[in-house]
Structure formats: C-alpha cells, structure tokens
C-alpha cells in the first residue's frame, strides 16, 4: 500500500506520472491521473487541482500536450447552459523519440570500449528518459559476451582529458595491451618496467566502435592515436601542451577533426598521400564507406573503376591488403611496391 504523501508533492507526482505513463500513443485523462495518484502515490486530488498543477508545469516550460473540447454546463446560479472547456488526453512530449533512444542504446551495446557494468548502467539511464511502454533491447546485454574492456577508468579518463584539452596541458598515462592470458597489462620497456607516455592531447573521437585520443607523443613532431579504453592512470601535468599547429603535418593550421577522421579511416598515424587505385565494381560502396564521397572515380568499365583519394598512407596500404585481389594500387609507386612486397611475404607463408 502506498505511503500517503504531502500535498506539496502533488505537482511533482503528476509530472512523474506523465513521464512514466504518457506519450502520443498513450494519453491520460484527468481521471486516469487521479487514479494513478491514489493507487501509486497515496494521494487524492480533484480534477481542478490536477488541471491547475498541469498548467503550472506548462508555465515552467514542460511540453505537455492535450486536447480541448467544449461542453454545455448549467450555470449553478442561473441554470442557464454555458460553455465549459474540458481538457483531456494529456501527454508529455519527449526529448528523444523511441527510435532515437534505441539507436543510442544499440550504440552502447555494441561499443566494446565501454566496460560491461558501466554500459548496463548507461542503458538504464537512457531507458529512464522514456516511459513504461518503451521496450529497449536490454535482452541483448544479457546475451552479449563480456568481451568489453576491463578498464574501469574510462569515464574518469575522459573527464581528465577533457579538462587537460580545455586547459592546454600535457598528460601522462600508462597504456594497456592484452597478453595471452586474455587480460590487459601495462606496456613495458625492454627492462620490464612499466612505460609511461607523456603526450599533448588535442581531441577525442569515435571510430568503428572504438574511442580514440588524437594527440602528439612528446618525443616526436607528428600525430599519434591511442585507444581511450587502453589508457590508465592518467594524470594532468603542469607543462603546457605542444600546439597542434606546430606539428609537421599541421602546416600551421589548427586541427580540423572532420578532415582528420576522413583521411584516417583506420586511425593510423602516417603521412597523407594522393592514392590512385583500381577496384572491382562491387567495391564502390566499400570505397565510399571508408574514404567518403570526395573520392574521384574514372576509367569505369565492366571490370572495375579507378579511384583517386587523398588519404593516410598506412590506411591505404591496409585497405589494399584487406581487399586483395579486388584492389590494385596504381600510385604512388612507393606504396604500390610496399603492398606488393607484403602480399609476396604473405604468399610465402603458404608455400
């Protein structure tokens, strides 16, 4: 039996009811709200009180929709019928549609960089943004193998990096890698001591279900990418970060994240090249998925099409190896020879 609550909580309980039980497909009358107040909150309220509190919520900025109808009601003094406005079919407009919430939840479920327990907690919070009728895919969590990261420091790492980037400070951290025991261990130096990385952080970005830190490793003048779920024991240093525009690839410009992500489809750190390659016609969708729509197609025939793309050299090499023999690098010659050599070495393994 519900515990009786003070009247001053009426407005909050009505808001809670609208959040839990209403949407465009499930509208509530004042009678419905009164019954839920009584059964779940131990409160009684007449229709005038409910309507008054709903009006107050609307005045506070809550988007509450309703339908309005007119009925004739006798004037209590004169008995003459008068128009009376009846409000009903109340529902609270959501910040997110069910489809949007499902998209967010599925993104969490199949993102391996978020620890299992924290993923489950986040899904619960997203579910709380909808109502009792919302059916998310939480069953997928129970069925998913717990192959997500073991690193429980992920969210603290993100917060500290966000602060370091805002303040323009370097950070230090240890970096994890898997051993044959299937557990993560800190990377070590040749002498066996744990290696500490000192970097200048610039941006964090998600790619292919993984979360990366784009930064500069202190010893060099180029860009490095590190998996956030493998960063541990991160500390903000007092030393100012190296400005991105001072790096050799920056050409005096600040980081353009959209361009960087487009040119680094595999998040490898190496020089960009103008790559010309031949692909089978069936590969066109894969090319656009990986390199974007700014590629140029030419010399199309039944066998294939030639593609020109400005991209990261290591990424182009990996793409050509992954999709051989349907991809043939034409230019630059240096890259063509590297791919050829890698394929020859791979073939030797099978001889």
Segments (PLM) and residue ranges:
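A structural signal for short hydrophobic beta-strand segments in well-ordered beta-sheet cores
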Residues: 64, 204, 234, 297-298
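Bulky hydrophobic/aromatic content
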Residues: 89-184
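Polybasic (Lys/Arg-rich)
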Residues: 254-351
